[in-house]
Amino acid sequence: MFQPFVNEPYSDFTVPANEAAYRVALAGVREQLGTHYPVVIGEESVETKRRIESVNPGRPSEVVGSAAGADAELAERSIEMAWLAFAGWSQRSAEDRGRHLVKLAALMRDRKYELSAWETIEASKNWLEAEADVAEAIDFVEYYARQAVRLAQPIDVVAYPGEENESHLIPIGAGVVIPPWNFPLAILAGMAIGPVAAGNTVVVKPASTTPIIAAKFMELVQAAGFPPGVINYLPGAGSEIGDVLVDHPRTRFVNFTGSKEVGLRIAERSAHVQPGQLWLKRAF
């Protein structure tokens, strides 16, 4: 169904045309600085009183933009919306889910330098590192599209006389994705798209220092035609919504990359069974 997987190539910025194109992308991004981005839960864009201001760490006086700061109530709503979307998304074929992923990868590829420029400004990555992060994000999306189709097939089991046995992998529900600031697109995409490819749904709580790159990713998710609620964008302070998302009795899994301290906290809290919780959580 899909062409064989090939890694996204890197650009050679000693080529004048590539250098010029990246400078154009940087100029275009600078024209968008200061834009505000709302929480996205399903089809709804939600404004809040609290705002998270993002600044260029290499030039702290430069405001990159702002994102709405979600509270505990919105965290609850986002989990419920993810479960509503799971009912339909989990029933789609792996091929259909894969097509959504391939469309997303194509959109990311079309805006590769723009996304890289956002990383240069919001995360202070140099050109090579910024583009490498975006290329890795595209690789994750393309790779998981193909893996979704492969893993949808029955798994070989040991034959036993007199029995007919099959083993299948199935999606498990709604989860939470908490990516770091230093690889704000690649790790976000990898931790979010893997579960989504398998038929799960997610709530993405981006790092508070790089919420704008995550907002741009969310725009592409919407443009790619993903059903509302499959991926939800929930910027907010970890101290305010982190425990709510991790502790929620309907959170099935937590994908986290970050500090040892926070990782141990998530692992510990995920192990506690909450009232009304039906399954043990999985913290990765």
Segments predicted by a language model, with ranges:
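Conserved small-residue-rich beta-alpha loop and adjacent elements
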Residues: P154-P228
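Hydrophobic packing residues within well-ordered alpha-helices of enzyme cores
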Residues: V141, A214-F217, L245, I266
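Conserved NAD(P)+-binding/catalytic subdomain of aldehyde/semialdehyde dehydrogenases
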Residues: P161, L169, G173-I178, A223-F284
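Hydrophobic face of amphipathic alpha-helices that form TPR/SEL1-like repeat modules
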Residues: M1-R59, V63-V64
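Secondary-structure transition/capping motifs at alpha-helix termini
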Residues: S90, D110, Q147-A152, A198, ...
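Glycine-rich loop-to-alpha-helix module at the N-terminal edge of alpha/beta enzyme cores
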Residues: K49, V55-A152
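Generic beta-strand/beta-sheet core signal
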Residues: V55-P57, W118, D133, Y144, ...
